[in-house]
């Protein structure tokens, strides 16, 4: 691996148990006479809600004050529920704040007006953390890089970035008295912030000393940039989370295991008995004619529908396509037992952040240092040398009291490689031109609640241009369902895990790693292809591997493509994961708002979130919804609820989306693409499409006029992702495509899955399906879209 796991100095965990305007964290109390400008700010009618202790404790998000020093994760007080089902606990497994969610500021007193705030909010990016040697890297501009909006209903200010913040980066925020309350008067500060701001009392010990030092350091940076620090009523520093580090580190560790030409996965992971020595191998069965294969395919009957076979067979020309079933052996990082939906990924290595903290602790440095030495690890290289970091794989470090140094094994930038739980024989379908062995191949990934077998509906269009198509099931789908109930085919929430958000994230992360793993297997298994329909596939001699994703498969595919654009520092390693092009249909980014804003999934998800967010809603559901499904129950509630009741459940949705996106940002396509674009361009040729008014994956998500339902929805849906990628929009008004960067918009006669097969009983969308398939085959044949036709009025 070229990239190493970056360590930064982290501030102490700062949820204080005794800090106010005159009390330090050790309990000593003294009267403090504040500077006159602080006294004035304390006496204002409307003040920031920032309290470090007591029943009204409140820290605006995001903040350095809610991070754990020893492992670099968020640390938000969870209340009584300390299980992973608590979103606040789940957020504690993340190594920084989200990059696509807003910043929150709560106020109390006279209140705020509904307003766009044009002055008094300052947001800067720093070169280093506040415990290092920071300087200003970028001055973000209000109205350009972010917008600040105040709400009379909630007395909140939301600061919404217009583009994703940089991952693994440091930011500081300041609010000054230029911001006005509902009466036009300047907002003020809180007692807790006054204690940190004042120079009349400097704390020398305890957590409050660290808080004060950081706060005054932040204000000093703003002062040097021209902001009057005497007018600052609140400031903070925060670190953003890493994005796609686990994808990168897992690719790098895998590539290093094959660097010698043989499989050394067991040596690298230090895990035996799981079958890692045969991982990334492909086994193929005997080719069968398409018609015979589909007719006999019970999985198609189960997961797609036996009634759909006749229509597909009716469009098939006999003896033109072969279907071969087979398996690819892929590492599985999720659980399959009783904890399948409660246990997220676990790291294969102890956290570098915890090791760093232990080596700085006089009580632990000898104990931990000697174990590292015994493992052949040079601690002087550990922070910067990727090969040295790999030596931590499979290692358990024990503290002087006999307990594990890192029992949680959270996946973070400090411990990014996941532990393998099993090696699975993942079934696939391979479609090839009859009797032929194509030189190029397309990996297809289906959408949520369906299965790989839906490729039967369109694969012949790709084989007709000389391509092979290989399709696998997403985790917990199709043949990869754990059983009939632990299956997204019976309940999408088996995959979209709303109860354990870290598992929901890792279901998606596993899916991306599966695509990358299948891609690697197509390179590593090449010697096994002799005499099979894959005998023509040899990446080393010029074979091209392309990606095709629909819906959730497109979400997975987009993140996989963006990740594959990052070099591992070795031509051979990069060749294991390269894609020459990608076609993404009806997909999008910022998954939490995408789902909440989905006409199809939104009501079901809102119902399940509201059950825990609102006792009134739960009471309503218990009384009124015994015979209704989840979506119908929620829709009935919205038709009957008061504005106050709707506001309560909406607040719950906002809390859920913030927590969910905090977990998802690390692998969300919008975040992964943004991070890649910030570190060099995305060079893979792309073809995207959408249908107008898509009911499953929304084109975009926006708040109703005058209300705030979704947080930072400007990143959610298909169109924001297409815009981020710089794609050329093609529609009825502009039919000339960009060969390698097109985004084609179809009109609303087409439906979400028209790409797979016509959805209208009267075939009103048949022409749309045909054009979608024609364009996709055209693009995937050579990574270039030649033409788009609107002769049948299919475009928006």
Curated annotation (Swiss-Prot):
Compartment(s) where it occurs, according to its Swiss-Prot or TrEMBL record: Cell outer membrane
A GO cellular component annotation in the UniProt record: membrane
Disruption phenotype: Mutant cannot grow with LPC as the sole carbon source.
InterPro entries for this protein: AB_hydrolase_fold, Lipase_bact_N, VolA/Pla-1/cef
Record PROSITE patterns: PROKAR_LIPOPROTEIN (PS51257)
Pfam families: Lipase_bact_N (PF12262)
Membrane topology: Lipid-anchor
Lipid-anchored residues (N-palmitoyl cysteine): 19
One GO-annotated biological process of the protein: lipid metabolic process
Signal peptide coordinates: 1-18
Induction details: Induced in the presence of LPC.
Single GO MF annotation: lipase activity
Keywords: Cell outer membrane, Lipid metabolism, Lipoprotein, Membrane, Palmitate, Signal
Lipidation, S-diacylglycerol cysteine type: 19
Function: Required for the utilization of the prevalent host lipid lysophosphatidylcholine (LPC). Functions as a lipase that cleaves exogenous LPC and generates free fatty acids, which are then transported into the cell by fatty acid transporters such as FadL, and used in various metabolic pathways.
Family the UniProt entry places it in: Belongs to the AB hydrolase superfamily. Lipase family.
Protein name per the record: Lysophospholipase VolA
């Amino acid at each position: 691996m070229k990239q190493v796991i970056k360590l930064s100095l982290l501030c102490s965990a700062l949820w204080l148990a005794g800090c106010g305007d005159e009390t330090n964290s050790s309990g000593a109390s003294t009267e403090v006479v504040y500077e006159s400008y602080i006294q004035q700010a304390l006496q204002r009618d409307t003040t920031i809600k920032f309290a470090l202790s007591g029943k009204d404790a409140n820290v605006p998000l995001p903040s350095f004050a809610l991070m754990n020093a020893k492992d670099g994760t968020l640390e938000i007080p969870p209340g009584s529920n300390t299980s992973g089902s608590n979103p606040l606990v789940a957020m504690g497994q993340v190594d920084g704040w989200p990059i696509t969610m807003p910043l929150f500021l709560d106020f109390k007193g006279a209140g705020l007006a509904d307003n766009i705030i044009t002055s008094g909010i300052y947001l800067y990016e720093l070169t280093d953390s506040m415990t290092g040697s920071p300087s200003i890297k970028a001055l973000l501009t209000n109205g350009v890089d972010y917008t600040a909006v105040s709400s009379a209903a909630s007395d909140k200010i939301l600061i919404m970035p217009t583009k994703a913040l940089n991952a693994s980066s440091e930011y500081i925020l300041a609010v000054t008295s230029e911001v006005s309350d509902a009466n036009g008067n300047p907002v003020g500060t809180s007692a807790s912030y006054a204690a940190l701001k004042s120079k009349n009392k400097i704390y020398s010990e305890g957590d409050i000393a660290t808080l004060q030092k950081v706060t005054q350091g932040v204000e000093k940076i703003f002062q040097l940039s021209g902001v009057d620090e005497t007018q600052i009523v609140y400031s903070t520093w925060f670190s953003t989370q890493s994005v796609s580090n686990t994808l990168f580190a897992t690719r790098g560790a895998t590539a290093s295991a094959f660097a010698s030409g043989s499989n050394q996965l067991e040596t690298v992971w230090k895990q035996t008995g799981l079958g890692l020595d045969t991982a990334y191998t492909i086994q193929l069965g005997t080719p069968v004619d398409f018609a015979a294969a589909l007719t006999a395919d019970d999985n198609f009957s189960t997961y797609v529908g036996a009634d759909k076979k006749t229509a597909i067979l009716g469009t098939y020309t006999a003896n033109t396509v072969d279907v071969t079933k087979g398996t690819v052996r892929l590492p599985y990082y999720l659980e399959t037992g009783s904890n399948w939906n409660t246990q997220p990924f676990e790291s294969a290595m102890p956290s570098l952040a915890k090791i760093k903290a232990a080596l700085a602790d006089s009580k632990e440095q000898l104990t931990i240092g000697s174990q590292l030495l015994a493992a052949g690890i040079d601690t002087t290289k550990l922070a910067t040398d990727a090969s040295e970091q790999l030596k931590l794989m499979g290692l358990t470090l024990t503290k002087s009291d006999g307990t594990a140094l890192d029992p949680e094994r959270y996946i973070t930038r400090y411990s990014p490689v996941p532990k393998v739980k099993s090696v699975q024989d993942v079934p696939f379908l391979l479609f090839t031109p009859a009797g032929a062995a194509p030189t190029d191949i397309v990996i297809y990934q289906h959408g949520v609640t369906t299965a790989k077998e839906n490729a039967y509906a369109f694969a012949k269009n790709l084989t007709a241009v000389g391509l092979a198509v290989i399709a696998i099931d997403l985790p917990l789908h199709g043949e990869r369902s754990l059983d009939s109930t632990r299956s997204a085919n019976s309940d999408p929430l088996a995959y979209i895990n709303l109860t354990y958000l870290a598992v929901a994230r890792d279901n998606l992360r596993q899916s991306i790693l599966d695509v990358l793993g299948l891609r690697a297997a197509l390179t590593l298994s090449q010697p096994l292809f002799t005499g099979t329909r894959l005998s023509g596939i040899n990446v080393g001699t010029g074979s091209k591997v392309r990606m095709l994703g629909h819906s959730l498969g497109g979400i997975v595919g987009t993140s996989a493509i963006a990740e594959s654009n990052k070099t591992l520092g070795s031509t051979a390693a990069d060749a294991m994961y390269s894609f020459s092009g990608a076609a993404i249909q009806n997909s999008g980014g910022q998954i939490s708002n995408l789902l909440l804003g989905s006409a199809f999934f939104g009501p079901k998800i809102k119902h399940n979130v509201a059950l825990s967010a609102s006792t009134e809603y739960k009471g309503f559901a218990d009384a009124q919804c015994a015979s209704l499904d989840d979506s119908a129950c929620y829709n009935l509630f919205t038709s009957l609820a008061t504005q106050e009741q709707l506001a309560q459940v909406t607040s719950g949705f906002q809390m859920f989306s913030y927590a969910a996106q905090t977990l998802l940002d690390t692998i969300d396509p919008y975040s992964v693409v943004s991070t890649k674009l910030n570190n060099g361009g995305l060079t893979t040729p792309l073809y995207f499409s959408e249908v107008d008014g898509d009911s499953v994956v929304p084109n975009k998500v926006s708040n109703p006029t005058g209300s705030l339902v979704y947080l930072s929805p400007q990143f959610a849906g298909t169109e924001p992702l297409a815009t981020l990628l710089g794609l050329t929009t093609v529609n009825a008004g502009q039919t000339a495509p960009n060969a390698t960067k097109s985004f084609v918009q179809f009109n609303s006669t087409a439906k979400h899955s028209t790409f797979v097969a016509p959805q209208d009983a009267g075939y009103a969308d048949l022409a749309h399906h045909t054009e979608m398939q024609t364009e996709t085959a055209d693009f995937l044949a050579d990574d270039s879209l030649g033409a788009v036709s609107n002769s049948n009025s299919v475009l928006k």
